């Protein structure tokens, strides 16, 4: 008997709820704001927000300020890497050779990882480079460069400060020199060894 009354009470509440007027249904529907579909063009959406001439202000491991704007007039290679990244370690000698052998090219290495400066110094004793290194946090990367989708990731900056090309994955000195020539920069003269060779 109690079960029957409980069933009647539940059905009665359901009928009453269904009979009430829904004022929200009478109101005109709001038009939702268009939401960009990141799957349609994820790279394009991110690139559109990036400036043509990115700024980069970091402090190197040596404690020196490094500002991309102060390197105008040179081709600058901005290389995101990490100590744990094997392909990053493989390209470091080529980037060092490029920085040493080509007066018109400068390289900055951005260690994109959570690592203490002392630990980075120990790493660089085993894997030395000829260019400055700065540690940047993975939670606060430079705003004018898109967050790397993988490591290593390298940007080639033209002497006027604009971005000539981006490389995802390991890059060889010859690829950078070819990209410089394609962008109107100096070609490697015949008979001169390629940096990193």
Over which residues does each language-model region extend?
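Sec-dependent bacterial lipoprotein signal peptides
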Residues: 1-17
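Bacterial signal peptide processing site
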Residues: 19-22
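N-terminal "domain-start" segment that seeds a small globular fold
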Residues: 29-68
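Short active-site neighborhood of thiol/selenol oxidoreductases, capturing the structured segment around
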Residues: 66-89
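Hydrophobic beta-strand anchors of alpha/beta hydrolase catalytic cores
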Residues: 77-78, 107, 154
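Structural microenvironment flanking redox-active thiols in thiol-disulfide oxidoreductases
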Residues: 89-127, 137-144
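Thiol/disulfide oxidoreductase modules built on the thioredoxin-like
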Residues: 122-130, 135-182, 191
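Short, low-complexity, Pro/Ser/Thr/Gly-rich segments in the mature regions of secreted, periplasmic
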Residues: 183-197
């Amino acid at each position: 008997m109690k079960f029957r009354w409980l069933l009647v009470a539940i059905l009665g509440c359901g009928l009453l709820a269904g009979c009430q007027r829904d004022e929200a249904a009478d109101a005109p529907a709001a038009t939702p704001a268009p939401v960009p579909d990141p799957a349609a063009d994820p790279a394009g959406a991110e690139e559109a927000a990036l400036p043509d001439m990115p700024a980069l202000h970091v402090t190197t491991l040596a404690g020196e300020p490094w500002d991309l704007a102060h390197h105008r007039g040179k081709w600058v290679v901005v290389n995101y890497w990490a100590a744990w990244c094997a392909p990053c370690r493989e390209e470091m000698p080529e980037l060092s050779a490029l920085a040493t052998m080509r007066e018109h090219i400068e390289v900055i290495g951005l260690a994109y990882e959570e690592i203490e400066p002392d630990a980075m110094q120990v790493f660089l004793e085993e894997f030395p480079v000829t260019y400055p290194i700065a540690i940047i946090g993975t939670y606060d990367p430079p705003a004018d460069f898109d967050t790397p989708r993988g490591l290593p990731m390298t940007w080639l900056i033209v002497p006027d400060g604009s971005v000539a090309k981006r490389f995802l994955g390991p890059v060889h000195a010859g690829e950078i020199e070819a990209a410089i020539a394609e962008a109107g920069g100096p070609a490697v003269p015949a008979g001169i060894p390629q940096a990193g060779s």
